[in-house]
């Protein structure tokens, strides 16, 4: 997946990011390190950008859960706020963790162009926050694998999502 995403970037054009911030989990951090090395961009790992912890469901596919825990999965999909994964992180706790990191990188890298490499749940939460959507509607936001969102943060304006890019299938 990393190579596929990297090859989509024009060969004669370097990205204009000044820093990369990433989840420390390998599927994000490995890609961040590869990009950082390729373009000589510093990389910072921040554990607060890790995916929501799925507890007993961790590392299991939806298909597996439909076989073993269909009722709990349906409740989670219907109302993730009140029905977290068994033994997993509650959505309000996830929100506090991610928004703490989000606020910190906005202060730390004020005025700079940052690439944040993270997971689908984190991206959904940040989009939901930027668009001021209720937390209980988090799962309505589609985040395809290896997609990119461009968020513009300007103190004179509300944050806005200005571009969405998906890796071609």
Question: Which residues are covered by each model-predicted region?
Answer:
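Phosphate-handling substructures
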Residues: 38-99, 140
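Loop-to-helix element that buttresses phosphate recognition and phosphoryl-transfer chemistry
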Residues: 1-30, 34, 85-98
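Short, active-site-adjacent cap segments at secondary-structure transitions
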Residues: 27-29, 51-53, 122-124
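Conserved histidine-centered catalytic loops in small-molecule metabolism enzymes
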Residues: 14-48, 74, 152-169
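Glycine-rich phosphate-binding loop signature in dinucleotide/nucleotide-binding domains
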Residues: 12-16, 105-112
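Short basic (Lys/Arg) and small-residue
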Residues: 119
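Acidic, low-complexity terminal tails and accessory targeting/binding regions
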Residues: 52-66, 107-112, 128-169
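Active-site catalytic microenvironments for nucleophilic, acid-base chemistry
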Residues: 34, 38, 104, 129-133
């Amino acid at each position: 997946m990393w190579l596929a995403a990297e090859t989509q970037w024009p060969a004669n054009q370097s990205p204009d990011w000044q820093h990369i911030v990433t989840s420390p989990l390998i599927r994000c951090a490995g890609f961040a390190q590869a990009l950082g090395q390729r373009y000589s961009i510093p990389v910072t790992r921040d554990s607060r950008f890790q995916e929501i912890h799925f507890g007993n469901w961790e590392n299991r596919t939806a298909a597996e859960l439909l076989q073993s825990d269909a009722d709990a999965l349906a409740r989670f999909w219907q109302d993730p706020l009140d029905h977290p994964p068994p033994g997993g992180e509650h959505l309000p706790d996830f929100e506090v963790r991610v928004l703490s990191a989000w606020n910190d990188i906005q202060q730390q890298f004020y005025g700079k162009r940052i690439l944040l490499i993270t997971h689908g749940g984190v991206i959904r939460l940040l989009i939901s926050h930027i668009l001021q959507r209720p937390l209980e509607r988090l799962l309505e936001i589609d985040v395809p694998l290896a997609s990119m969102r461009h968020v513009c943060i300007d103190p004179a304006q509300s944050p806005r999502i200005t571009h969405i890019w998906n890796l071609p299938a």
